[in-house]
C-alpha cells in the first residue's frame, strides 16, 4: 500500500495557536462516511488528520497547531487534551474493524508521528478514554463515559496491527478520584484485559449505565434500563436535543 497524504486544509488552520506541547495522540472514529465527516472536520478544524476507508490520509490542521478534536477531556490531570495532542479521525465506527488499507495507512502515520514527537505507545489513546462528562441528574459527579468514540483502538489485536504495544492499564483520573465512572461496560472494555475489570467501588457512579439494547433502533427509545442520558449523552439538556 502506497502511503499518501493529501492536503485538505481547514480554513481555521492558519488561525489556530501553536500547541504548547505534544504528549498524546488521540484516535477517533467518525461514526459516519468519509464525505460528510471530512466536510465537517475540515470546516471546523476538528482533527489534524483523517484516514479514509480507502487508506487515503487527509491533512486538515497543521500538526503543530491546536485542533479541536477532543472536546471536554482530561488525562493524567491535564485538560483539555486538545492542548497536548494530535487528533486522528478514522472513518468508521467504534465497534467495527478497519479496512486493510486503513490499517496500513494509520500504522505508517503513527510511526512517523511517534518518531517526530517521541510519543510512547502508552500515550496513544482512544477518544473515549480521555472524554468526560459534566454532572447531570443521572451522574452527580464529573465522569468518564461521555463517548465510545474510538473504542476499538483499545483492543490488543487492533493495537498490534497498528504497530502498538498494549494501551494504558488503568485510568489515571479515575484512580486519582478526579472522575467517576458512568459507563461501567465501557470501563471494563478498556481496562479488563489489563487486570482492572471492575470499577473501583469508591469511585463508581451511583448508577451504572445499563447495557444498551440491540438492535440500534431500539437503543434510541426510552424504556426500562434506557434513560434519556444514555441516549443523548453529551447532548443531554442542550436546547437542540
Task: Locate predicted features.
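Basic/polar, cationic surfaces and motifs that engage anionic cell-wall
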Residues: 1, 93-210
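Active-site-adjacent loop/helix surface patches within enzyme catalytic domains
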Residues: 1-120
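Soluble periplasmic/extracytoplasmic beta-strand elements of cell-envelope proteins
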Residues: 26, 50, 87-89, 125, ...
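Primarily a LysM-type cell-wall glycan-binding module
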Residues: 206-239
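A generic secondary-structure boundary signal that marks alpha-helix termini
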Residues: 115, 240-241
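Alpha-helix initiation/capping motif
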Residues: 33, 120, 154, 238-240
Amino acid at each position: 500500500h502506497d502511503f499518501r497524504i493529501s492536503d485538505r486544509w481547514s480554513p481555521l488552520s492558519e488561525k489556530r495557536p501553536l500547541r504548547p506541547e505534544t504528549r498524546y495522540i488521540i484516535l477517533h472514529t467518525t461514526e459516519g462516511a468519509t464525505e460528510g465527516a471530512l466536510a465537517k472536520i475540515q470546516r471546523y478544524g476538528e482533527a489534524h488528520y483523517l484516514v479514509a476507508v480507502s487508506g487515503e490520509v487527509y491533512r486538515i490542521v497543521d500538526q503543530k497547531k491546536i485542533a479541536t478534536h477532543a472536546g471536554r477531556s482530561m488525562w493524567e490531570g491535564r485538560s483539555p487534551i486538545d492542548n497536548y495532542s494530535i487528533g486522528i479521525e478514522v472513518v468508521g465506527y467504534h465497534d467495527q474493524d478497519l479496512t486493510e488499507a486503513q490499517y496500513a495507512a494509520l500504522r505508517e502515520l503513527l510511526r512517523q508521528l511517534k518518531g517526530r514527537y517521541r510519543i510512547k505507545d502508552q500515550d496513544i489513546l482512544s477518544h473515549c478514554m480521555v472524554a468526560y462528562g459534566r454532572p447531570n441528574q443521572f451522574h452527580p459527579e464529573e465522569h468518564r463515559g461521555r463517548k465510545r468514540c474510538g473504542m476499538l483502538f483499545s483492543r490488543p489485536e487492533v493495537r498490534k496491527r497498528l504497530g502498538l504495544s498494549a494501551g494504558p492499564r488503568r485510568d489515571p483520573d479515575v484512580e486519582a478520584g478526579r472522575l467517576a465512572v458512568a459507563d461501567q461496560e465501557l470501563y471494563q472494555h478498556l481496562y479488563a484485559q489489563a487486570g482492572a475489570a471492575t470499577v473501583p467501588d469508591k469511585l463508581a457512579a451511583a448508577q451504572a449505565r445499563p447495557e444498551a439494547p440491540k438492535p440500534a433502533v431500539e437503543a434510541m427509545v426510552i424504556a426500562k434500563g434506557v434513560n434519556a442520558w444514555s441516549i443523548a449523552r453529551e447532548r443531554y439538556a442542550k436546547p437542540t436535543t
